Amino acid sequence: MASRLLLLPRRRSRHGGASLLLARLLSSSSSEAGGGGAVEKVLVANRGEIACRVMRTARRLGIPTVAVYSDADRGALHVRAADEAVRLGPPPARESYLNASAIVDAALRTGAKAIHPGYGFLSESADFAQLCKAEGLTFIGPPPSAIRDMGDKSASKRIMGAAGVPLVPGYHGAEQDIELLKLEANKIGYPVLIKPTHGGGGKGMRIVQRPEDFVDSVLSAQREAAASFGINTLLVEKYITQPRHIEVQIFGDQHGNVIHLYERDCSLQRRHQKIIEEAPAPNVTAQFRSHIGEAAVSAAKAVGYYSAGTVEFIVDTLSGEFYFMEMNTRLQVEHPVTEMIVGQDLVEWQIRIANGECLPLSQEQVPLNGHAFEARIYAENVPRGFLPATGTLHHYRPVPSTATVRVETGVEEGDTVSMHYDPMIAKLVVWGESRNAALVKLKNSLSNFQIAGLPTNVGFLQELAGHSAFEKGLVDTHFIERYQNDLLSTSTQALSGSHEAEELGAILAAACICKKDHVSSEVSLHDKKLSMWYAHPPFRMHHFAKRLMEFELDRELGGSSDDLLKLSVTYRSDGTYFVETEDGSSPGLDVKVDSRGDHDFRVDVGGLQTDVTLAFYSKDNCNHIHIWHGKHHHHYRQTLRAEQSPDDSSQPSASSEARSHPKGSVLAPMAGLVVKVLLKDGARVEEGQPVMVMEAMKMEHVVKAPCAGYVEGLKATAGQQVFDSSVLFTVKENKPN
């Protein structure tokens, strides 16, 4: 049986006291109730932003915290945020954050009587929850039995079916023989979705359109599932071609009470991973909201659930029906959007329920106030298919947090995003009285979220938030695929429209750089402070001084231009700068610059004043210049001479061989681990034939031959780490001798 989605505008519920609730949620002052009971000291068995998030609430409740860390995270923000910290082991997760016995031992050594698992890692491990219980520790989460029942997606489907929760047609059995799975897929009918029975986050999911691709997809999904969750069993379901992903936040206590805190729409995804979530879901009726909430509560009650959980549904936009997909037995990454619309701290609820307290609200008392968005900011290379990226945060300036804007992060400027863990840098969460108001706030906050040093998806998120279909709430899980050309700004019209802003950005950057040099590089000459412009050629101590500058544009969303922007900057005696393009393609501009710090400037162009931020760093034999002006962010490069190249030493760069690779060379698409080498050096290959499999941040990537020929220089072996853009092998037309 399925429930139907009615696509009608939502009547916005308005409740008083929203500002007070949000202020309480974000406050760092101590709670009037305190944190007694079983949870008197908590170890957070996680890292990054979620560890910092849990510690913030614990601190507000007066509860001391213990962090755990790998060698890669020795100086991480979550370690510094805790009262105590314990080393777990080397960087690989299986030797650190997935080492259950080491984590329990850390809790016992430090006297922490409770463990909060966060999300990911061991958060959905029934064995870990059971181990905590056996050692007399409070696991801040659901009972092990519920984790086990719902963690096995095949078992959970059977339980949900018995409870009357609607299910997608599919195979959920224990038998994993590949021929049986193939037979079941044929019965279901293509396209089918292959999904691991354990874990989440899109890891190991494969959409298979044709029977001939099924076996390879199963093998790849099994490898990725094993690497991510330690279990490689799969289920096969009918693939809904035009789905929405809507999930319901539920909460239960140890006294049998279960409520829902409304739904979230998580349809905007790439690689089956969410990147923008919102609450409540747009364009649904109150009747649908009630029905899907009731189904989620029924699902939780069927397994005796307590603590925070999320019941995920797939909604068929063609038929209007929704189906149970899975239940996440933990706090979700996107829980802040729910916190914003109900005005409650869900981590505090988890702690109080672990203490044996009742739910603080009944279903009728849960408010629905306004609208909230969350945008996940990742280190990733968008033009390369959203592959994860690594590097140093040379400049990191999130938007300031307020009562209606939250930034959840686990990094600071100078930190390194490594290949070992998820590449998420931060979560930007905004709230408004309506969806439109919240969306305006999201767009503005994204345009002011400053990161430089490695590729990110901030520009892509801006394109998403500004797309007309998204503004109308017309979302499904194929949104990014459908509007790819719009979002990646690859059309001629889009590139033409951005050129003016890019040129203006270069002009402003040139003027600000000159101002910075003028102010900070003064020398003493005859007891007078004069700019280095006057002390060093080619500038003269005359009425005017001129400087030539070149900028090579690096577009975040691809379509990089090989053309150089050549600018001439003339310093005038009145302190202004006249900047013009060397080719005279556009009229010159008079720019007045006031310095407001190392990175911040106020510029005046023809009477129009605006704030500008610049970031500088050197990497890969280039000076990198980032500028933020208005809603725009641009990245320019300037090539350095060899003696001027203080490359970033914290992150190894590609070798000189990779920078000057011959025709047919295949470069590593990301920094990562070689999982499997499928061919031998010298082997004959066809265009598109898989040669090796790489893995980074738990995501698998198949490296294929770019053309037909013979493999040469294939030296990588399974287990070897390679750097981004390093040469993996070359495909040559003729067989090597």
Curated annotation (Swiss-Prot):
SUPFAM superfamilies: Glutathione synthetase ATP-binding domain-like, PreATP-grasp domain, Rudiment single hybrid motif, Single hybrid motif. Its cofactor is biotin; Mn(2+). The keyword Repeat does not apply. Mn(2+) 1 binds at E312, E326. It comes from Oryza sativa subsp. japonica (Rice). Its EC number is 6.4.1.4. It comes from the Eukaryota. The active site is at R330. This is Methylcrotonoyl-CoA carboxylase subunit alpha, mitochondrial.
